[in-house]
């Protein structure tokens, strides 16, 4: 929002913020304290020479004081934002020092907030989350004069930070608020819609996720070889898979793989193969699952996603009842992820699925795994889908053993989870 302060009020606030006395300013401009008081109250005139001395004395030579300077500053601010948005950090960093003089003006809350929020995006893109979080924590003190653009950037940044912390519901709330604050300068883009779609997926709401991911594809020209296009396609296909739309998911997964290979992005290609393996396992096409899994293992050999590909290999071996090799793969996986608290439950789960006839394993799956994965904020999100799969597995197991009472108990839990996924909403805490 535009500051309505007079010139005198502005220099008074600057003086007070810098801890300068009226007498000191009077000496600098070769006048009296009374004149300075009148100047600050708008009762005295100043010329260009005096203005230049005041600027130099306060260290605000390059700070925008007047309307034309402020408009020029805003224009450069949005150029800076565009550089950051386009990942052109070299030019963004070059502009940053030229825009920082706004921080010398204690009354320019909105422009300072805008500067901080664009700077926060730079911190995040550089991986400096501590600095970004510190900036966000100071932002609320500037909200009294915040413009729609500033609020958009604040909520976008806060949503991203909380997404990285896996605080999904609050993250979603901020991203949705960022959409509510779109303007001509800051509009929603495919990245925001991807994040919203991803969080809905993590929270076990695949169809809400599909709505935003499809919107990202139709509303924006992403470019057929862009990383963002590949990310959106992979997320979209994953949602279709968990929604039971296997044919749609398979087409998109294969397209994602082709796109990734076209730009020699083995990690993206491998990620597509990991999820395609899951799809083939769900369809019962074990041969295709093995082929996709082997491709994923080759592509992801030096990446953290390799653990997921290895887990899929164990699932494939369970389906072919090759329990001896499956045991070796599980042992390898446990050793690989022993220091990663987010991945260790994956191989613990598989080890119990591989020994389903053991009462200790069924007890683990019922009383530990299902409650654990039903929590939407575990295992990188999306755990609720895993909980539903475990219910289906246990129900089939108990029916095979003719333990109908247990089968019915598990079926009830499975139906409740199904209702959560396909008919429940997201409840935000105040």
What are these regions (language model features)?
Residues 75-86, 113-126, 152-167, 190-204, ...:
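Tandem amphipathic alpha-helical repeat scaffolds
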Residues 19-37:
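Short alpha-helical DNA-recognition segment
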Residues 96-104, 136-144, 176-183, 214-225, ...:
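Amphipathic alpha-helical segments of tetratricopeptide repeats
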Residues 89, 129, 168, 206-207, ...:
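TPR-repeat structural position
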Residues 70, 107-113, 146-153, 185-195, ...:
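Alpha-solenoid helical repeat architecture
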Residues 1-17:
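A short, Lys/Arg-rich alpha-helix, primarily the initiator
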Residues 49-64:
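DNA major-groove recognition helix of helix-turn-helix/homeodomain DNA-binding modules
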């Amino acid at each position: 929002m535009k500051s309505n302060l007079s010139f005198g009020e502005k220099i008074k606030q600057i003086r007070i913020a810098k801890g300068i006395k009226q007498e000191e300013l009077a000496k600098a401009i070769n006048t009296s304290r009374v004149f300075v008081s009148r100047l600050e109250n708008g009762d005295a005139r100043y010329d260009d020479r005096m203005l230049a001395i005041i600027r130099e004395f306060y260290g605000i030579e390059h700070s925008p004081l007047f309307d034309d300077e402020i408009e020029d500053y805003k224009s450069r601010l949005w150029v800076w934002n565009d550089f950051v948005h386009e990942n052109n950090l070299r030019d963004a960093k070059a502009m940053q020092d030229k825009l920082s003089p706004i921080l010398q003006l204690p009354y320019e809350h909105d422009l300072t907030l805008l500067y901080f929020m664009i700077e926060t995006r730079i911190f995040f893109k550089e991986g400096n989350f501590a600095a970004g979080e510190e900036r966000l924590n100071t932002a609320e003190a500037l909200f009294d004069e915040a413009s729609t653009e500033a609020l958009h950037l604040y909520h976008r940044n806060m949503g991203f930070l909380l997404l990285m912390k896996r605080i999904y519901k609050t993250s979603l709330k901020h991203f949705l608020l960022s959409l509510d604050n779109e303007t001509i300068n800051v509009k929603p883009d495919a990245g925001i819609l991807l994040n919203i779609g991803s969080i809905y997926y993590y929270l076990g709401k695949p169809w809400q996720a599909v709505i935003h991911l499809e919107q990202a594809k139709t509303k924006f020209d992403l470019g057929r070889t862009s990383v963002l296009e590949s990310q959106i396609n992979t997320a979209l296909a994953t949602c279709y898979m968990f929604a039971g739309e296997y044919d749609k998911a398979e087409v998109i997964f294969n397209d994602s793989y082709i796109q990734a290979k076209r730009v020699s992005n083995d990690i993206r290609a491998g990620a597509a193969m990991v999820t395609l393996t899951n799809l083939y396992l769900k369809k019962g096409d074990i041969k295709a699952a093995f082929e996709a899994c082997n491709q994923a293992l080759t592509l992801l050999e030096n990446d953290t996603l390799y653990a997921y590909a290895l887990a899929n290999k164990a699932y494939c071996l369970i389906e072919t009842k090759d329990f001896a090799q499956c045991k070796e793969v599980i042992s390898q996986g446990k050793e690989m992820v022993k220091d990663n608290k987010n991945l260790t439950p994956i191989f613990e789960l598989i080890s119990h699925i591989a020994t389903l006839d053991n009462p200790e394993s069924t007890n683990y799956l019922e009383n530990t795994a299902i409650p654990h994965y039903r929590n939407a904020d575990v295992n990188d999100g999306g755990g609720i889908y895993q909980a539903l799969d475990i219910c289906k597995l246990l129900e089939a197991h108990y029916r095979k053993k003719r333990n109908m009472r247990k089968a019915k108990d598990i079926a009830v839990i499975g139906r409740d989870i199904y209702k959560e996924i396909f008919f429940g909403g997201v409840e935000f805490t105040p």
